[in-house]
Amino acid sequence: GATARHNIRLRGGQCYALLAVGGQGLNDVDLKLHQGGNQIAADDTRTAFPTVRHCPSSTGRFRVEIEADGGSGRYFYQVFRRSAN
């Protein structure tokens, strides 16, 4: 399926949860988080609501990849800062 890429900046010492939501007609979305050339987190389960969590040790640029793996349509994503617990 089609893949969209978004660059984000995450702060070291913080924890984050990323959520993608497939809109109408998009019933399987894959969500991946990369830093440099390395994939560091992924959710490729068969769902329209994938999530990943990451607590980077240092501040840096990350790439979010959102892939339409079943169906087609719009998607939405959000990055939440969360507690380390």
Where do the model's predicted regions map?
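Acidic, Ser/Thr/Pro-rich low-complexity intrinsically disordered segments
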Residues: 1-76, 82-85
